[in-house]
Amino acid sequence: MTLPTSLCDLFAQAASRCPDNLAVDHTEGSLTYRQLDDVSNSLANMLMGLGVNQLSPVILLTSHGTFNIIATLAILKVGSCCVPIDRATWPQERINYVCQTVANSVILNTTSEPFMPSEGAGDVLNYTSMQSGPSFRPNPVFQAHKVAADDTAYIIFTSGSTGKPKGVLISHKSLCLYSTTSPINLDIGPGDRLLHILSVAFDACACMLFSALGNCGTIVPAQAEDVLLQAPSCTVLAATPAMLKNLPSPTTENSIFSNLSRVILGGETASPDLLGLWIDAGVQVLIAYGVTETTSMGSIYRVERDPRTDAINPYIIGGVLEQSPIWIVDSELRIIKNENSEGEIIVGGDGVAQGYYNDEQKTRSNFIHWNGSRIYRTGDFGCWVLDANGRRVIEFRGRKDRTVKNQGYLVNLDRDVEAALYRVGESFGLTSVRAVATGNGIVAVVTPSNVNTSALIEKAKDIMCSYCIPYRIGAVDDLPLSPNGKVQHNELAELIKIIDEGQHNQENKADSQLSEKIERGKFGDDRHLDTLLTVARDVLSLPGQSFRILQPHDSFFAVGGSSLLAFKLVSVLGQHGLNIPARELFKNQPFSDVAPLITSRAHSSTWRLTEHDDKTQQTLAELQNQACQMLGLVQNSFEIGPLTSLQLDLALPTLGDESRNINQVKIAYNAPHSGIMRRAWQGLWQSEPVFRTEVSLAVGCGALIVHNKPFRKYRVVSHSCRDKYEEAVKGINMGVGLGCTLDVLTYHKTSDGLPYLPVSSNHNSSSSETDELTVVLTIHHSLMDGESLKLLLDKVDRIALGFSQPLSGSSINANLALIKTQNSRDSEVRSFFSDYLRHLSPENIAPGQVSATENLEGSSSRETAFFETSVSSVEVSDFAKLNCSSAACIYYIAWAMAVAAFDNSPDVLIGAVVSNRPALQHHEHAIGAYMSTLPLVFNFRDDEETVVDRIQKTMEDLATVGEYAWARSDQCGIGRRMRTLLSMQFPLPNESSKPPALWTESAENSDFPLCLLVESSGDFRMLYDATQFNWEAAQRLGQHFKHALYSLHHETRVTDCMTVNRLQENLAKQSEIFRLKPSERIVKQVLEQVMGQFPSLIAVEDCLGGKLTYSELDKLTNVIAHHINSTVPNAEVIALYSDGTIQWILGLLGTVKAGCTYVNLDPRSSVSRRETICKQCGAEALLLPNASQASEAPLMDNLKVLAVDEMLSGNSKKHNGKQPDRASLDSSLVIVFTSGTTGNPKGILISNRSFLSMETSYGTTMFAAPGRRIAQFMSPVFDVCNMEIFSALLHGATLVLRDPSDPYANLHRVNTAAVTPSAMAVIDLDDFPNLQLIYACGEPVTKSLVKRYTKRALLYNAYGPAECSILTSIERLIPGDQVTVGRPLSTVRVYILDEDQHPMAPGDRGEVCVAGVQVLRDYINAPEQAARNILTDPWYPGERMYRSGDSGSIGRDGRLSLHGRIDRLVKLRGFRVELAGVEHAVVSGPTEEGVSQCAAIAVNGLLIVYVSFERSQQHDSLSNKERIAQLLSRLREQLLPSSVPQEIVHIDNFPRTINGKIDTRALETQYSSYKNTSIEKAVGDCPITRPKIEDKLAHEWRQVLQLIPETQLQESDDFFKLGGHSVSIMLLATRLTAAFGKKITVRELLPSPTFKDQINMVRALLEIETFHKEEPQMLPPLLTEELTSIEKQVWFQHQVATTVTAFNIIRVIQIEGAVEIDKLCQSLNNILSIDPIFRSNIVEGPKGPARILRNSAPTVQEVDEFDIERALHHRFNLAHDYLIQVYLARHGCKGDNNDHATLVILTSHVIADLGTLQNFLQLTSTAYSGSTLVPLDRPKHLDSKSWTRIPTFSERKFWSEYLKGLIRRLGLTHHQLALAVGALFLQWFSAEDDLVLGAPNSGRPTSQEQESLGQFLDRLPIRITPNDLGNDDTMTKLTEILNRVRHSSLKALSNAISFSNIIQDLGYPSGGLEHPLFECDCFYTVS
């Protein structure tokens, strides 16, 4: 932001920065900056109508107030200058003098008293009213006058030393300088409130006015009588010492200056005592020296005590300000540098005024030119001294006109009399001294009036020189002051005379009193309807936004009311003397029916503090005495009252745990707002009573003590290290006991590497801006509830915006009122709750047995779990309105349902946290704990109850119970025995707040066992006691709540909302009994234990009716294990032919019991693949289920083939004893082979330890237990198959095998299955009524599938790489919720890392990495893959971490979201596209789209998406084509154009891989074959008609834009919006020229970007039979030795360059796969010899540089390794070196064609560009494929017409006009140009000058150049004007700016000619290396 040079610009910048901040706060009207700007514009228009202009000063007759400020701005905006007159303090004589002096000027009167000007004065405009607010519309035609920096802004009339007013001319520049100079501008910022009391005609008043208005502060104008009223809210003050002396002391009790942090004093010298009083109170006091003639600028000094003597020197005025240089000179104006040498003070700089009004002679005498500077001679004397800290400063020695002769001696009244007499009189209580010389000698006046003046004179005789002692001293209470607040010395002598005559009467100062501002409305009592509608509208209105007018037929909740607002409505009606039970509002009656129920009540029934009865007064007195005696407090230094019952309940647990019942909120702010918010919070901390409130349990039965003065200090800690800052923010302790703390943490980035110096807490300077600020408020719950926090946060925001801080109500009075209500209505409330709870059994009241946890020893018992909602708060609110209820009601019902399912009980008691403030009339704004937890009873016994009925019943209960919101817990009949509560949280600041918060976070430590806190967004937190609820139970409760909340919105019956939750709870509790615990056992041991535990249960069942009990299974598998150990002794790995039969399962388990590792082979795979797997894993035997399958075995030596049926035949069964344990925890259980992304199988070892670790986690066992039936559904080679088998058999469940003829048949006979989403998409859950639990594995799950499957079943999303033992996370999927894979298992750690292995921030995407015990040790025979994927955990040394290759992010709730594979990044049309991201966008649409599955593929440069739709939705009215159109429309809105698919294809059944996943390669093949034909139609020789033009043009668009052939182009389609750019439009022009046989250039295409325009353009060209065409002239072709113009330019630059390596071009290519390296070398050598360009050298001859051709071409050089760094710094000798060098490094043995190699091409820009390299590689590919290429005789690029074509006249004319007006030297440095370019991208636009950037021009317009080798790359100037950048309109959209810049670049491109021609045509020297057009090239490089 540029520094403003006029006050109008200064204010405009502030109004733009902070439009909604309060600018002025006064009874005449409080205005924001936007409003102040508007109303001052309106007044400016009025002034312009009176003829006011730059040449006519305006006399402003004014006083402090809003109108004064509006008028000042209006005068300045019309270009006039302001002549302020203080009507409140100036005598009429002086007013008349100024009006006559500034004759014929308009007089603007803002005072209420009319003004009659004297003769000769101008017109009078009275301005005492204004328009503002939402209805105000400023005059749209007003435009502020363009004000120059040197224009006069003010004429300030001062009395001076002569008494005759003189007008000082002060410029805009001078006042801007003051307002922007620290610290004389008091460092005012947003949130600061300036107590504006200086006279409005005082120069310093104008300075401070714009110091505030120019820096977004708030001005609080105040006359003397208003100071005490306005001061408490202000943070800064400008005053004279005399004014300050008359203000109350800042150290008194309840000081009105508790918020004041900075004071600036000037005008006269203050006494040391006065200064000490303020700085000792912690206020920063600045002494400013300056006179009106220097715009109050000169020097400034911060008052400090001498650290040795504790004294204050009041005469020090500071050192030299850079903006206002100051000197001390002798009488000859020679500079005095010596210390203690007195001289005159002179001041220079831009603060020096312009002179005196109409007094040129005086101007010349006082404003002189001296040593090259214009300075002002002040007439003041001073000298250089050293202050207490050794700094060189000026000590003020008085004015030269204050030096008088007394008794023949020169005496300085300031120094010799006043200062000396003050020192003498300190012991007499003297506070100030003023002296004046009279004809009889020196007289003095001292204060106060009780000073013994006679004794003072006598003592002075002992110390002072006799000629310095006044002959007469008078004592008064107040000194006479001028209107500017200075002491009037010329009245002192008269004052002495009056004292002597005894006629002096001191003026009495009456205290101002506040007038009554709130007037009660008078309402008729005819049914009270009008009152009810008016009050309800006010209650429903938002701040600054009125609610619509309510009608009698409206009902409260239907129009948006809530339960909290209902109680507020009752409270407000009570203030009007009206009473209505809240339950009547909850009945959803129209207002017309509610009004008759309102009754009147006497106002006297309201209990107030002033009505204390005797008993209360006695109680308070006793508490006061006890506090003094027991706590040592001083009487009258505090207020005290009793604690409420709730406060006592909250306080008692904290005695044992200082962090119990503590609330903490953290709010972070970024740099623009950090300073404001820091000051706002610190001001609130000092002034808010709650922060000086103490809870004492030692006094009475517990007391609340409110101290009069703050006794707690906030903490400020600064950090320059980001990590330490974040660590400190996280580590703020919550153990504050019964008190509170405020921590202010700041983060400062330091660019110099030096540490940031922390600022102490009492330092108030804001000169250093903070990069980030975090405020942490930690407070005990007894001091503050949620609504109190909201009140505090609102106050902080108001303070930050400049508004005054509203006073909080008395918490002691509120407590007394609450206790009185509770006591007076005790019997009533007890009777009510006794009846309400009568049907509830005791076990539902007291906490029963809840899920116990094994709490870790020493860990906190309080835990917090965060959940994202399934239904947004907006949806809940809308649903509540639809049902005429409150949002809280919906949440209460959902929570009750969740608890009912968890407890398996139909009766539930929920604690509802409600505010009891509505019962505390006149105490609604008290800060404290004013809420109650009331019991809500829910009964879910009626299976037919509807959701609507339940909502109505709950609303009635809320209304009835809410009547007793004031009740104590014991009065509710259950005390604090409720174990669960729900609390609606108030919103915290966010990015939309004013000022905005960067982030917020809250934490609580409740004493309740289970608390649900619903945030304003709908997300919720669960606080639970870990000794009663474990983590898994808390997660289930949260999931129950989410499901119930969603179901309430979509189900009809209540029981249907609870079915799935009850199922989940039953499964969880049943499976918990049989869940494995961590142990040192192996799988064999666990398996044998289960077989012995459940011998008669069915273990395995097949499709043919075959069944085996666990006992039978045990024996048969023992036989197989025995056979394996005897047949293949010491075998390690056994392969299994996995045909899905019982024999296969027997073989698998037998292998495990034999202590071997098994590997499943897929019968569907080829024999060769099975052989490959057996070889890789080293299998020693193959186990066939049946001997008849022998032909399926690979023919391998040393592979023993065994058959299970043969093992179990005959006498073998007698060997059924238990086998010894051969395996260990670390030995492998199974080897899983996956194809991966390469197609080659990779072997993954899963050990016993890692597998059993996975099985011990919650949910990984598929909730298996005896009686559960689990399907074996997955492919045997899929890792999840192992989870199916062992989840069943390790937990006593039944494993149901597949039917080979019907893969879905076994799902009819199971209740649990693991299924891929692909399979889920094609089956109907209704066909499988027994299926209760589904695990989705292997693929992403769509929201549509979630919605369909979760209506009656549990759906879990399972994720885990096989490398991490199958599962690493699982998540119950709930409709409406985000689809994630949940939180990591307890046995793994999941990190999200970037490419450099650094952690990503929450929410950011990165690679999913998994660490922990489940990570594999190694791959089988894949060391490179292992080295790449299996790393050491950086944070846990010695443990492994696996890089999954999956893209993911972790949300705020800790759940992992997947975004596809990282390796699915493709490049289409030059843009990077994440296929996984496209798929995610497709499936994350609304469920109504019905997308069940999708796959994105890239084929031939096109982005294609395949989708399938839900079967149930295919019969809707929309066809698949219409669904695809809707989907495509949404994707165009949501995705970048490059990521929008060119085509979406519907498919019923996706092709599958062997593991059941979608086969994308098969889709690519399918699409290629489907789209293999072209739709291009032949065009005959017949006349071209419009349809054929359209067809041809459409075909060319599709080719250039790479659109699919079927794309139907619309007439409105825009070439650029479909992906076109500058290069593609050139290509289109070339293709259209060939297609239509007419020359079509970019110049014709640019004005016609739409399809319709181009049709018309082509048609018009074709219809013209003859037309004049300007053909360019041609030069003779270039000779072989001649250089092109570009080659010459590059050669010249190469000769003079300091870094010639900058001209190097290097390309490194990694070659992998089946490439014949020798053949590749031969092809490269062929191409190097074809075009002589590669044999070129450039030599300097007599005619300049020329080309010579070498005899031989360069060849490929084979090297062992290549040093890239060295190549980059290779210095080509253009005359002797080959200018292209090709290197090849093999990475295997020569002749090994399957290995990989590195190809490096190094060349010089003199002969090549990027196009050359691309063509070189393309030619190499052609030669490699076997094609023969013919060698050329001369370089092909020399034949291009580009070198011989002379630009046409129109082309030359274009460039002359395009660059017209551009100065030859821009006057910008490289750095400034870089800033300008950066400004373009950062939207910080500059209108200072034109920008011309150099852009690359490929120089290859035709196919001849496009296919040539050689250097064509040229430069093209792109002019970007201020208009392009939007400087003419600050609201210009970014897209419009980009379009303008693009248009300019395309214009240049369409007229491109040789850059050398452009330079020549502009008249610059030919061949100049440093052309003046631009010094910055802008490139876009695609890597």
From Swiss-Prot:
Phenotype of gene-disrupted mutants: Completely abolishes the 11'-deoxyverticillin A production and conidiation.
Pfam families: AMP-binding, Condensation, PP-binding
GO terms of biological process kind: amino acid activation for nonribosomal peptide biosynthetic process; secondary metabolite biosynthetic process
Record carries keyword DNA-binding: no
Residue stretches making up the Carrier domain: 526-602, 1584-1662
GO cellular component term of the entry, any: cytoplasm
Annotated stretches, region: Adenylation 2: 1089-1469
Spans annotated as Condensation 1: 769-1047
Enzyme class, broadest EC rank: ligase
Induction (record text): Expression is regulated by the cluster-specific regulator verZ.
EC number: 6.3.2.-
Segments for region (Condensation 2): 1652-1976
Keywords noted in UniProt: Ligase, Phosphopantetheine, Phosphoprotein, Repeat
Domain of life: Eukaryota
Adenylation 1: annotated span: 11-405
Keyword Ligase (UniProt): yes
Pathway assigned to this chain's UniProt record: Mycotoxin biosynthesis
PANTHER family membership: NONRIBOSOMAL PEPTIDE SYNTHETASE, NONRIBOSOMAL PEPTIDE SYNTHETASE 5
Entry note about domains: NRP synthetases are composed of discrete domains (adenylation (A), thiolation (T) or peptidyl carrier protein (PCP) and condensation (C) domains) which when grouped together are referred to as a single module. Each module is responsible for the recognition (via the A domain) and incorporation of a single amino acid into the growing peptide product. Thus, an NRP synthetase is generally composed of one or more modules and can terminate in a thioesterase domain (TE) that releases the newly synthesized peptide from the enzyme.
Annotated function: Nonribosomal peptide synthetase; part of the gene cluster that mediates the biosynthesis of 11'-deoxyverticillin A, one of the dimeric epipolythiodioxopiperazines (ETPs) from the verticillin family that act as mycotoxins. 11'-deoxyverticillin A is required for normal conidiation. The nonribosomal peptide synthetase verP is speculated to be responsible for condensation of amino acids to form the carbon skeleton of verticillin, whereas the cluster-specific tailoring enzymes are involved in further modifications leading to the production of 11'-deoxyverticillin A.
Sequence similarity: Belongs to the NRP synthetase family.
Protein name: Nonribosomal peptide synthetase verP
Gene, per the UniProt record: verP
